[in-house]
Design a protein with these regions (language model features):
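Serine-dependent carboxylesterase/thioesterase catalytic core
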Residues: 125-135, 141-244
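Flexible, membrane-associating and regulatory peripheral segments of lipid-active enzymes
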Residues: 1-124
Length: 244
């Protein structure tokens, strides 16, 4: 068993945000009910605010990406209906992730795989992207476990706003723990977004080439991303993400 990260700074931040958001719903709702509002309408209003906030989060990523989209071949077009369905699924994923999977990462998204599961092949290490934690890849983890990959480990990036180099060093230590825990000689690395950059740096500067049997990057901004543009002053990692 590898060392559990427990609450990361990211998870603690989202837990506090969840408590504050919940307290605001309760306080404002209680005030509205005391003023004579229908409790059912108050609950509906709170739910509408909750879902709308998650919708705005998705739009904040979707719209810049849509404006900077690359030209597509005709065979890659999915049409308006499929695009809308994809957006709705992303919205629902945001409802589950912000705040639940993020805020409750020690319980809902442990670093270690469940004990006693059958496994085939090399152990798998999942590496989430910027400003996320293990909870973000819970669906990937669950899918791999259902598919017979019982040794799936997940790492939360730390520290959140530091450089990709710091995260790659953190990944190097984590991979060594996984190899010691499983007795395997190599791992499979799967990274999402910034997780792919972290894996690339780990492979080339932290001795990961000999320890990775396979490395997969999904949606990683190797050429930079417009979502990070203009936010470089928030931390060195934003500058790296804006340029790739």
């Amino acid at each position: 068993m590898v060392r559990e990260q427990g609450f990361t700074a990211h998870g603690r931040g989202f837990f506090i945000a969840f408590v504050v958001e919940l307290a605001l719903y309760v306080l404002i709702g209680a005030g509205c009910i005391a003023a004579g509002a229908d409790p059912v309408h108050v609950v509906h209003g709170a739910l509408a605010v909750f879902f709308t906030l998650r919708l705005l989060l998705v739009l904040g990523n979707f719209l810049p990406s849509w404006r900077a989209r690359s030209p597509k071949r005709a065979e890659h077009e999915i049409g308006a209906a499929a695009t809308l369905a994809m957006f709705i699924r992303e919205w629902w994923a945001a409802v589950l992730t912000y705040p639940f999977l993020f805020a409750f990462e020690p319980w809902l998204a442990p670093n270690n795989p469940p004990a006693g599961r059958p496994h085939r092949g090399l152990p798998v290490v999942l590496v989430p992207g910027f400003f996320t934690n293990r909870g973000y890849l819970s669906a990937w983890r669950a899918h791999l476990l259902r598919s017979g990959y019982g040794k799936v480990y997940t790492l939360s990036p730390e520290p959140v706003f530091e450089s990709v180099e710091r995260n790659a060093g953190h990944l190097a230590r984590f991979v060594d723990e996984v190899l010691a825990d499983t007795g395997a000689g190599q791992v499979i690395l799967i990274g999402h977004s910034m997780g792919g950059l972290t894996i690339r740096l780990y492979l080339h500067r932290f001795g990961g080439m000999d320890k990775a049997g396979l490395a997969i990057a999904v949606g990683s901004p190797f050429g930079g991303t417009v979502v990070a543009a203009g936010k470089e002053r928030l931390g060195p990692i934003l500058g790296q993400l804006s340029h790739g």
